[in-house]
Amino acid sequence: MSAIILGIESSCDDTSAAVIKDGYLLSNVVSSQAVHEAYGGVVPELASRAHQQNIVPVVHEALKRAGVTKEELSAVAFTRGPGLMGSLLVGVSFAKGFARSLGIPLIDVNHLTGHVLAHFIKAEGEENIQPKFPFLCLLVSGGNSQIILVKAYNDMEILGQTIDDAAGEAIDKCSKVMGLGYPGGPIIDKLARQGNPKAYTFSKPHIPGLDYSFSGLKTSFLYSLRDWMKDDPDFIEHHKVDLAASLEATVVDILMDKLRKAAKEYKIKEVAVAGGVSANNGLRNSFREHAEKYGWNIFIPKFSYTTDNAAMIAITGYFKYLDKDFCSIDLPAYSRVTL
């Protein structure tokens, strides 16, 4: 009998629903919220209200595109955390009510696990090459920077993580200082393609082990701009492409330095990247260069799977469904939770 899983994602400012049948993606609908751009960041209350408006039509559209009726669903998987509590509660509450009304199992999914397992989403007509266990996954986003040893679908170990800011957060804040707008990641990425990555040098942390730190880079960037603008008030406008390229190169160097160490220490050649920052062109190019130089088998997600989406929640739910790993209807959402 087929396993058809509805996945629901509402951890931040994207409302998403997806349907997976026997591991194959049938639909993935994402509704993004433009309302936050005017505020230079996500406003939790506005995000929660938008989720309430979007959740029903998004789920309806996901089922419609999949050609599946709600009565055919085997289970409902939802993001339990981490994320914004007000946003999470919308998805969690809907999933509970929907599953209960249909009399089908409920499956809680860790948002971070979903990003890692996005590499196992299969789609008809696409090349479906997946990493072999064990593999390393660099999970980088606005809220997380982690090196994860993935031993199985349900067995992961964090080898290193940021002790302060995440990589994506540092990029967004530096972009904001430059007056480039929100979200900063895609803007920096676009500008960096036109600039010289060696034009400027910024501070790199010396953190023991496999942990990361990006607060020093952020401070170095801010102080450097302040000094340069004393001599030239229009310095940012005149040099923004080189600034973006140098910032991006520094972040990528920091990320890849620790990932190389992890790959060498654990003798692993299967290496993946996941999370919002995995859409960055400089990071993707660095992965390809490392694959050629060190013989890595690399796995870079489709752009549609880098940002928050329900397809990754549905595939994680599918694996948990096969293990009959269901949750109780009284399970709470968690704004802060690790793997």
Swiss-Prot record:
PANTHER family: TRNA N6-ADENOSINE THREONYLCARBAMOYLTRANSFERASE (PTHR11735), TRNA N6-ADENOSINE THREONYLCARBAMOYLTRANSFERASE, MITOCHONDRIAL (PTHR11735:SF6). The lineage of its organism: Bacteria, Pseudomonadati, Bacteroidota, Bacteroidia, Bacteroidales. This is tRNA N6-adenosine threonylcarbamoyltransferase. Substrate binds at residues 139-143, 172, 185, 189, 280. It is found in: Cytoplasm. Pfam families: TsaD. Belongs to the KAE1 / TsaD family. Its EC number is 2.3.1.234.
